[in-house]
């Protein structure tokens, strides 16, 4: 009787592990990233955190983003089901509401910046973020 349930659980765990393996891996380098998210796996479909919590994206809403008043190539994704997941050390991704958008851009020197946003409208600039994390590509 438990065999089908065990098989289903195993399939779900294998699928989430395979997803993380197919996405690009980013190593946490900023103090904030190391203490909140740990390493992350990111692609056009979602973001998985070191503790295996994840955010799924519904669509790409912008391919450029204002950072320090400069337009940079980057990606702004809408989160399919906004959430503020509990990550490492009991910390939350944003801490001030559900994350509805995630943006990432090249921060130079082999680094990637990932910012998270609350709100109903897509963010226009980094000034609107609730948290910023930096990773090594």
Where are these regions (language model features)?
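Bacterial N-terminal signal peptides that target proteins for export
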Residues: 1-7
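Hydrophobic helical h-region of N-terminal Sec-dependent signal peptides
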Residues: 8-14
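Sec/Tat signal peptide C-region and signal peptidase I cleavage site
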Residues: 16-20
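Short, solvent-exposed loop/hinge segments that bridge or flank secondary-structure elements
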Residues: 22-24, 28-56, 80-103
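N-terminal glycine/threonine-rich, aromatic-flanked beta-hairpin/loop signature
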Residues: 37-76, 114-132
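Beta-strand-rich cores of mature extracytoplasmic or soluble domains
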Residues: 78-137
């Amino acid at each position: 009787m438990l065999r089908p349930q065990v098989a289903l659980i195993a399939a779900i765990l294998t699928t989430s592990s395979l997803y993380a393996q197919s996405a690009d891996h980013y190593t946490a380098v900023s103090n904030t990233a190391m203490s909140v998210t740990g390493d992350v796996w990111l692609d056009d479909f979602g973001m998985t955190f070191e503790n295996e919590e994840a955010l799924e994206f519904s669509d790409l809403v912008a391919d450029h983003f204002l950072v320090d008043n400069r337009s940079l190539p980057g990606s702004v994704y809408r989160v399919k089901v906004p959430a503020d997941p509990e990550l490492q050390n009991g910390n939350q991704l944003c801490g001030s509401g559900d994350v509805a958008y995630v943006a990432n851009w090249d921060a130079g020197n082999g680094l990637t910046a990932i910012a998270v946003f609350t709100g109903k409208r897509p963010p226009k600039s980094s000034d609107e973020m609730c948290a910023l994390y930096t990773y090594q590509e």
